[in-house]
Amino acid sequence: MSENIKINEIPSGERPREKLLFYGAQCLSNEELLAIILRTGNKDSNVVELSYRIIHSVGGLNGLFKASAKELMELKGVKEAKATQILAMCELYKRFKVSELTQIKISKPSDVAKLVLDELRMLRQEVLILINLDTKNKVISKKEIFKGGLNSSLVHPREIFKEAVKDSAASIIICHNHPSGDPTPSRDDINITTRLKECGKMMGIELLDHLIIGDNRFISLKEKDIL
């Protein structure tokens, strides 16, 4: 048996490349698209089977885009070459999304939610994201600032405003998730917001809003008159 089962060894009607050319990329499954990137399987599985195992081992596409080289290479059938192919693909997508951000203007909380809801709502730990805006409320950048249990003693305004100054932001919005799915603000959430609001006034970089993301829903502290 060949050490690496290639795409052209899969029955012609099941080959991802041929399906893409004939039907279009939108007709392929996630596993088939990844198979085209990886090109070969291994001695135990063809490339489509390997792609299926990779995607499902990391918890779907969201997990794939967050996986490190070490985590990928711990999967059966994934060595350095395939791990770097996956990481390069993910990085290209991330850069594309960043280039899209600069076209977005924020006028209401739902505009912000569109940027972060899918990313944050399914996470198992709290993550704080900073959105930097220019003088016209257009997005300059979106950055993950903190990961872990959020409380007012751990989230330091210095880390947030350092990134805002670096990007020449005129104003900022922060967002974080509640893994419980309930976006009701905690006392720590309110304390963090108050501290950042006061620091923003001193630095001339206004905190416009703080969004808390739950399970497919969100709360804006601005709309709740907490900010």
From Swiss-Prot:
One of its GO terms (molecular function) is metal ion binding. A motif (JAMM motif) lies at residues 176-189. SUPFAM superfamilies: RuvA domain 2-like (SSF47781). Residues 105-227 form the MPN domain. It comes from the Bacteria. Keywords: Hydrolase, Metal-binding, Metalloprotease, Protease, Zinc. Zn(2+) binds at H176, H178, D189. CDD domains: MPN_DUF2466. The keyword Transport does not apply. GO terms for biological process: proteolysis. PROSITE patterns: MPN, UPF0758. The keyword NAD does not apply. Belongs to the UPF0758 family. This is UPF0758 protein CPR_2111. It comes from Clostridium perfringens (strain SM101 / Type A). The lineage of its organism: Bacteria, Bacillati, Bacillota, Clostridia, Eubacteriales.
